[in-house]
Amino acid sequence: MPNSTLTLAQMLIARRSLTPDDDGCQKILVHRLAGLGFNSEAMNFGEVENLWTRKGIDGPLVCFVGHTDVVPTGPVAQWDSDPFTPTVRDGFLYGRGAADMKSSIAAFVTAIEEFVELHPDHKGSIALLITSDEEGPAVEGTVKVVETLQARGEVIDYCIVGEPTCTDRLGDTIKNGRRGSLSGNLTVKGIQGHIAYPHLARNPIHTAAPAIAELAQTVWDDGNEYFPATTWHISNIRGGTGATNVIPGEVNLLFNFRFSTASTVESLKTRVHEILDRHGLEYELVWELSGKPYLTPKGILADALSAAIREVTGVEPELSTSGGTSDGRFIADICSQVVEFGPRNATIHKINESVEVADIERLSRIYRLTLEKLLLQD
């Protein structure tokens, strides 16, 4: 049906699904897919709504991962049209979630519809994992569904995450991996005192400074063929009472690693503690792992998606691991081949978020051709 993907995208954008509120988006998808033979399960945790819906029981299983939640709009007055009234203007669809990532969800659903109509006896299975908790804490969304699937022994063979990956034109970038994210909350202890009597105090900012300098100058690894070198950066420093005559009793630092597969979580932790200990600091350090790095080398899935992109757009996609974390990091625990592909990301999270209307239908064709290459060919 002409423009069916656009119509579905508009239906989803019209829902005010601010994290963790799905606002009925998943019900739209369940209703749409029921007629194709999909069996749907609500896997809700806390305030988060998750959907696992699958057609077929045989392998291979191709899964699409997406999120219906969106970030806040910012000042509505700065939008040229209401962010939850999907508006087509000058060849673009405007609205919060247009690019990130309701158009991708719509495109995959219509791709399935056309695929099943053309190939009703296809081999394998198709599934969607949709959450309303990707833009927020991401602790009761995809990760919880993955844990549930793991517990009952379900395995995903190929996974496409619908994140907006392209930069200049549709098809130019496939994400075939992401760096890991490891954060630290470091408190260095000192002795508070009068700044005129430093011999009666111990300034933790002064004692921590050499260690901070060493951490900032350390080469953690050299990266590899797929990833740049691991980086360490401070995001926040807090210390002192606000007075100019008081030596602080402690200083607090928040820092973050973005790390490649050339390093491990434990190796990074060990090296940080070694540096802090070598400088004789009295400290407390709390770690938080947001996600491990994952990588899908060239293979069946990346090749199939790349070929589909070339057929539809004529563009040769680049495989990239740049950018922040995504829900792909959770799927990688139960799927060895995970890639991310969606529309251009130039306007995501911005005022007047938009996606080119022509790209929405092209994206659906790319997804359908990818399904054909994965589920029709031996």
Swiss-Prot record:
Cofactor(s) this protein cannot do without: Zn(2+); Co(2+)
Q: Name one GO biological process term.
A: diaminopimelate biosynthetic process
Instruction: List, alphabetically, the Gene3D superfamilies matched.
Output: Zn peptidases
Q: Which UniProt keywords apply?
A: Amino-acid biosynthesis, Cobalt, Diaminopimelate biosynthesis, Hydrolase, Lysine biosynthesis, Metal-binding, Zinc
Q: InterPro entries in the record, alphabetically?
A: ArgE/DapE_CS, Bact_exopeptidase_dim_dom, DapE_proteobac, Peptidase_M20, Peptidase_M20_dimer, Peptidase_M20A
* Enzyme Commission code: 3.5.1.18
Binding of Zn(2+) 1, residues: H67, D100, E163
- Catalytic activity line of the entry: N-succinyl-(2S,6S)-2,6-diaminopimelate + H2O = (2S,6S)-2,6-diaminopimelate + succinate
**Residues engaged in binding Zn(2+) 2:** D100, E135, H349
Q: Which PANTHER family match?
A: ACETYLORNITHINE DEACETYLASE, N-ACETYL-L-CITRULLINE DEACETYLASE
Role, per record: Catalyzes the hydrolysis of N-succinyl-L,L-diaminopimelic acid (SDAP), forming succinate and LL-2,6-diaminopimelate (DAP), an intermediate involved in the bacterial biosynthesis of lysine and meso-diaminopimelic acid, an essential component of bacterial cell walls.
Q: Which NCBIfam families does the record match to this protein? A: dapE_proteo, PRK13009.1
Q: How does it assemble?
A: Homodimer.
Q: What's the name of the protein?
A: Succinyl-diaminopimelate desuccinylase
